[in-house]
Structure formats: C-alpha cells, structure tokens
From Swiss-Prot:
<dbReference type="InterPro" id="IPR006224">
    <property type="entry name" value="PsdUridine_synth_RluA-like_CS"/>
</dbReference>
<dbReference type="InterPro" id="IPR050188">
    <property type="entry name" value="RluA_PseudoU_synthase"/>
</dbReference>
<keyword id="KW-0413">Isomerase</keyword>
<dbReference type="GO" id="GO:0000455">
    <property type="term" value="P:enzyme-directed rRNA pseudouridine synthesis"/>
</dbReference>
<protein>
    <recommendedName>
        <fullName>RNA pseudouridine synthase 1</fullName>
        <ecNumber>5.4.99.-</ecNumber>
    </recommendedName>
</protein>
<dbReference type="Pfam" id="PF00849">
    <property type="entry name" value="PseudoU_synth_2"/>
</dbReference>
<dbReference type="GO" id="GO:0009982">
    <property type="term" value="F:pseudouridine synthase activity"/>
</dbReference>
<dbReference type="InterPro" id="IPR006145">
    <property type="entry name" value="PsdUridine_synth_RsuA/RluA"/>
</dbReference>
<comment type="similarity">
    <text>Belongs to the pseudouridine synthase RluA family.</text>
</comment>
<dbReference type="InterPro" id="IPR020103">
    <property type="entry name" value="PsdUridine_synth_cat_dom_sf"/>
</dbReference>
<feature type="active site">
    <location>
        <position position="134"/>
    </location>
</feature>
<keyword id="KW-0694">RNA-binding</keyword>
<dbReference type="GO" id="GO:0003723">
    <property type="term" value="F:RNA binding"/>
</dbReference>
Length: 345
C-alpha cells in the first residue's frame, strides 16, 4: 500500500493520520514519472551540498507529447478567439472570464471595450493583463486600461493583497481533514520543471541561478465521491486550520490492483503566487488535479480522455485601484464543477 507523505504537522493532524488509510489509487490511465537521469545528477549535487533535492516527482516523460498536442490546439483556438465574456467593466479596468484551453494574451485582442474609456473616445485604451492564468485554467482575469492603473493592480497582486479562490476537481486519496494549510518550498529543478521543495530549503540556490522560494496554500474539501456540501468561500484564519510544513518526499502515486479511487472537489486559497502552485500542492497531498498530466493527474477517467486540467479561478477580491472601494467578483461555475455538485448528497 502506498505510504502517505512524511510531513511536519500539528498534533491534531497527526491524530487524523491514525485513522485507517484510504484505499490506494485505481487503475486509471495516468502518466507515471520515471526516475530521470537529470534528477540523479541533482541528487548527487545535493549530496555535495550544491543543490537541494525536490520532494515532488519530475514530469512524466510521456507528458511532453500530451502537452505539445494541447499547446497546438490552444494556439489555434487562441488565434480564432474573438469575444471575451466580460464580468465587469468600468473606465479603468475589465474583469473577464477566460475559458480553458486559451492563452491569456488572446483576451487582450478579444476584449470588447465599451464606450467607458479614458480620455477621447477615439483613443484606444492601453490594455494590460494584471494577472495570468495557465493555458488550461479557466476563470477570472483582470485587464487594466491605462499604465497607472496597471501598475497599482499588478503591485496588489504581487504583494498578495488580492484574495483569490480556485476550484479543482481531483482524483486521488480522500483527505482526512476538511481544511488545511500547506507550506513548502517552490522552484525549478535542473531541467526547468517546477517542483515542490522542503521548507528548510527555502533560500537555497537552484540550477540556473534561481533560489527556492516559499509557497503556501489553504485547502477546503467541498465533496468526496458525491458526498459533501458546496458552500460559499470561507474567511477562515490560520488558527482555524491544520498546518502542514513540507520536509519529506511526496508519496509515490503509482499503485496496482483494482482498488477504487476518490473524486474530490476542493477549493484552494493561494497565500502566495508561485507558478503552478495549486497544481503542485494537489499533487503533493495525494490528489492531483484531473487531467493535469504534468503533475500526476489522470488523462483518462471513466472512459473519457481529458484535453486539459480541471482548475478554475472562481473569485477575486481587491480594493479598486481608483475608487478605493472593496470589490469582489465571481465567475460562473465550469461544467465539470456543476456536474460534480449535482451528484452531491
């Protein structure tokens, strides 16, 4: 049976681990990461004190072909993309709903700017992306219309003053907790792959001249295998949740046999803004996002091949950079979330 990750955790979380372990993963089609020569050299470098060793697995070799196919499809789709759904728009910014499988930059040319532009109506606004989403992630993005507003809002995102929530549909081990906060390191390994690192490695040098940086995410379980309750985003504080500090290698997600798997709907509250942060933490916790081939997610489930991962930028809350008023925006739920919620008892 696959062993759960070894973690530094709070006493209550330790008690939760004394419960009977969940069944191993099912025989769903999943791209398995084999040990790569690059990671062996990383381990050797770490042994000499040069580089830290990642605690999450490398990209599966077969994911390269899947990612290339998805990228080609997204490029064609982005080139033809002509109308971005607008959730909100005023003189200074627009909040749009990005579909999955479209690159962020396509939204700039697809934004149907209203008459509410700065200055002369004949002057085209200077559009900027205030935030970005991965190609296959759907949900809310903010587009600013002038340099001054762009600078203020980008700074707000960089300084983590924008509150964000995401929904993710995962396939893996059902967690024993309802809410949790996970803290780890984050960085690129020798061949450029984003990986999870131990918190004790934060600040250490990595190949390519970068360093391990800290990242933290709060998770809330909304449903497991059709049981649970979909609810509004929580405003919970740190002391209300269990806390995990990553120090050890993640569990091996491969398994044999006919064991069943769990379908898990989680809401993520990223506390930092690292690349692929939610995807990496879901992988480490043992329930990778469905369709996320880079990070151990199944590419086929219940007879269906998925062309992207099930991750959605659900909400954004921030102080308007011009009016100074607090604003909150919500995105309509994606079809995969509605389908799961409809099965919840």
């Amino acid at each position: 049976m696959t062993r759960l990750p070894l973690l530094l955790h709070s006493p209550r979380f330790a008690a939760a681990l004394t419960t009977p372990p969940p069944p191993p993963l099912p025989p769903a089609r999943r791209l398995v990461a084999a040990a790569a020569g690059g990671d062996l050299s990383l381990a050797m470098s770490a042994a000499t004190g040069e580089y830290p060793v990642p605690v999450s697995p490398p990209y599966p070799a077969a994911s390269k072909d899947v990612e290339l196919r998805r990228a080609m499809t997204a490029s064609a789709r982005s080139a033809a993309y002509s109308s971005a759904p607008v959730v909100f728009e005023d003189e200074w910014l627009a909040v749009v709903d990005k579909p999955a499988g479209v690159y962020c930059d396509a939204l700039l040319s697809a934004l149907p700017c209203s008459a509410a532009t700065l200055g002369d109506e004949a002057t085209k606004p200077n559009l900027h992306l205030a935030n970005r989403l991965d190609r296959d992630t759907s949900g809310l993005m903010v587009i600013t219309k002038c340099n001054k507003v762009a600078g203020k809002l980008v700074k707000a995102f960089t300084e983590h003053k924008v509150k964000k929530t995401y929904l993710a549909l995962c396939i893996g081990y059902p967690p024993a907790w309802e809410k949790i906060k996970i803290c780890s390191g984050h960085g690129r390994s020798k061949h450029g792959a984003w990986r999870v690192y131990a918190m004790s490695d934060v600040g250490r040098s990595l190949p390519g001249g970068s360093v391990v940086r800290d990242m933290s995410t709060r998770f809330e379980v909304l449903g497991i295998n059709g049981k649970g309750q979909f609810r509004e985003p929580s405003n919970f504080e740190v002391d209300e949740t269990e806390s995990i500090t990553v120090q050890e290698k993640a569990a091996d997600l491969t398994s044999d046999g006919d064991e069943k798997n769990s379908i898990i709907l989680v809401r993520a509250y990223p506390q930092s803004g690292r690349t692929h942060q939610i995807r990496l933490h879901c992988q480490y916790l043992g329930f990778p996002i469905r369709g996320d081939v880079k990070y151990s997610g199944v590419i086929e489930w219940n007879g269906v091949d998925y062309d992207g991962h099930a991750l959605h930028a659900e909400s954004l809350s921030f102080v308007h950079p011009v009016t100074g008023l607090p604003v909150t925006f919500r995105s309509p739920l994606p079809s995969w979330a509605n389908e799961f919620i409809s099965t919840m008892a």
